[in-house]
Amino acid sequence: MTLLRAPQRFQYASRVFTSTSLSTPRHAYLTYSRVRSLTSTSHHPTKSHPSLSSSTSNTTSVEENDAPKSQCTPQASQHIPWYLQEESSVPAVSEVTLQEKLPELPENPPKILPELLEYIFKDLGLDELKLIDLRPLETPSALGANVIMIIGTARSVKHLNVSADRLCRWLRSEYKLSPYADGLLGRNELKIKLRRKNRRARIASRTGTMFDDKDDGITTGWICVNAGVVEEHPVEERVEGDFEGFGPLVGGTRVVVQVFTAEKRAEMDLETLWEGRLARAQRERQKHADAAKDDAPEEVRYPNSISPSPSDYKSPNVPRSWISLPHEQRRQFHIRSLRSFARPAHHAVFTPRFMSQNHTPAEHAIVGSELSSPTAMLLQYITTMPDQQLMSALGDRPDDESSTDFLRLFHHSLLGASPNVLALARLELLCLAHSRGHTGISKESVHRAFMGCCFSASHIPDRLIPTVVDILLTPRTGDNPDGEKWFTDADKELALSALDQLVLRGNDFMNLQFFTRLYYLSSLPPGPPGEENDDGLTPAERGAHVVRMIEILDIPFDPIHARTLMVYLFRNGDYDAFMKWWRTLPLKNSPRTREDYEMLFRLHADSGDSRLTRECISTWAPMMSREDPPIWLEGDLVAHLRDCLLLADERTPARAAEGTQSLFAKLWRACERELNKSEVV
């Protein structure tokens, strides 16, 4: 009994618990209708706690007060746990719909774009979506032409990789596309790298060393998902002079999704970059549109107008040039006669009657087809002049502007012309003078006119390009044209700069004809003989790099220019390269002919090298009968072979007369028989 009796100071607690458990359910104290305050009291019952009777009476009174409430509200007697209670309805401050969070669609969007945006925002969970339409850019980006770029922010690095991986799988499964995610790690690869990184961190913490948290390629924070072409459309015809930024021109719209983390997106700031480019492109288009609007003629009349208004007549100063180029001067519609062009009084020698003469189609091709331009007609007229009259009309220097009446009239017709028209007209005149044999044309003037056409984006006719290249690749000579020739370093710089521009314009110089001429020019000395600028190299050493370029670049074989190159190689002393090309002829489906053997023996006879000539006769004279078809001794071949035999051994005629059966003696007797036959005939 003593063990079951509670201590005296805790008797009230046991009685309170007993009375409470008998009167009310245990969980009644957990309801929200009653709140129990927390107080700090002493453990002595006489000071801090009321008597047992008062406590019991208070409890009973409280229960009696609660009884009527439970009877009035029967639902209150049923306890609802806190995790099952319904939250109080809080009015929504601002509800943003899905369409309001998605960016607006551009004009003419591809069919996949709305579904792609919804999938990126709703399923992948990317935030702050931004759509940039790069299709208006004339020069496409490195991603290609006609790009629509979507920029989104991921919540973490793991979310970044998972979103990009799911997007690629969705594009492949739903639309059969072939997306490429630049910077994406595979699922297993990312887990393995993260696991290894955590292991290194644990090992570093155990050993007490510092963990080098370097950039290991896991947390790049940027993945570019290129979906490729999502909608095909026909490729527009390219305008000549237009450029494609990177890669070939492909029709269709491509979509690129740029996924960033928040920090990386703020660092890269692609929105500012591309929006700035779009703004500049828009300003350029607006500038061209305003210029075209200002230059547009106020009124265009049909050619069959009978009574034109007096305001339609304009001053006949400088009409439009014959060169039709985009973004140039405005085109004027008129029906004026050719005789209506005004001309100065001191140019009476050029009367209008030559402008109405009948010209051949070839002359039309030289100067253009728009006969309404006085510049074109002046060039057309000068093509009909005899050579002597043309030389006097052009003077000593055709690049001069006032030395002759023709040059003054020619440059007067170009007053007010645009820079590209002016440069091309001067280039036309210089090329025309060179084609007629004028010797006063300088390379500098042709190069200046040519580069002016290139810098002004002028269209250079194909017929002028060979003439320009021929002028710039012509060696310099002294007073004697047949004397020594040289090609200076300044001439090389002029030629290379012009060739660079021609290659950029799409001209093909990867042919043996061009490289043969390069070899000839590179083998020339850099200055006149007797001056200090001689480099001390032999012609073969100067042109050796061109021969190596022909082999490395695998220049296509040309039978005619290959034989020309062989002549240059032999005369420059590069016998090994000559014999290499000589043996290559049959392998290139170009069998050796009688003319080839005539060239072979003529070059050896002119060389004066007896040892080299002796080897040539011993090796290749017996091969003539083995060629397909066989080559017999006749014509000029006999004379060249006799010269080689005399150079190889002066005693060959005497030994042949003695009846010696050596190869040289037999060949000499065969040559003598052929010469006797030709004399008899």
Curated annotation (Swiss-Prot):
Compositional bias annotation for Low complexity: 40-61
| Cellular component, GO annotation | mitochondrial inner membrane; mitochondrion
Q: Where is the transit peptide?
A: 1-45
Q: Where is this region: Disordered?
A: 40-74, 284-320
Report whether Mitochondrion shows up as a keyword of the record.
yes
Q: What residue spans carry the Basic and acidic residues bias annotation?
A: 284-301
Membrane topology for this entry?
Peripheral membrane protein
Q: Which GO terms describe its biological process?
A: mitochondrial gene expression; mRNA stabilization
Q: Which keywords does this chain's UniProt record carry?
A: Membrane, Mitochondrion, Mitochondrion inner membrane, Transit peptide
Subcellular localization is given as: Mitochondrion inner membrane
| Compositionally biased spans, kind Polar residues | 304-314
Q: What is its main location?
A: mitochondrion
Function summary = Probable mitochondrial mRNA stabilization factor.
So what family is this one in?
Belongs to the ATP25 family.
Recorded protein name is: ATPase synthesis protein 25, mitochondrial
Name its species: Emericella nidulans (strain FGSC A4 / ATCC 38163 / CBS 112.46 / NRRL 194 / M139) (Aspergillus nidulans)
